[in-house]
Amino acid sequence: MLAMASGAERRLAVMPLPRQVNWRGRSGRFYALMPERLDSFQLVGEDLFLLARGTLPVWVGSAFDVINDAQSRARFRLALEAADRAFAVDVEADEVTRMTVVWDLEGAEPVNGLSAA
C-alpha cells in the first residue's frame, strides 16, 4: 500500500522557491538573495549564507566561518534552531568585501515592492 503525502507536503513539493528577494543592508545597499530550503541547504567552502527568522537575520557567514571561528560556530548552531529561512548570498571572493557584506547583512531587512532582476 502506498503512503499518501499530506496536503501540506504536496504543496511544499510543488511550490518552487522564489527566484530572488531583495534585502537592504544596514548601509542602505540592496542585495538580491537567492532563497534556499532551510532543511536541505549545505554550507560549502566560502559560499556566503544568511539565516533569518522572519525578517530578522540571525546569522550570516560561510562554512569557513563555522570551521575556523568558535563565535560564529556557536551563533550558527543557535541560528539553526531559530531560523525559518535561508538565503544564498552572491559576493565577491576578496576577504574585505566578504567581511563588509557580512556586517551589512547582519543588520539587513527585506524590501517589499522591489523585484530582483
Predicted feature residues:
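GIY-YIG nuclease catalytic motif and its immediate N-terminal context
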Residues: 1-76, 82, 95-106, 117
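Canonical phosphoinositide-binding patch of PH/PH-like domains
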Residues: 87-92
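Conserved "boundary/linchpin" sites in short secondary-structure elements
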Residues: 110-112
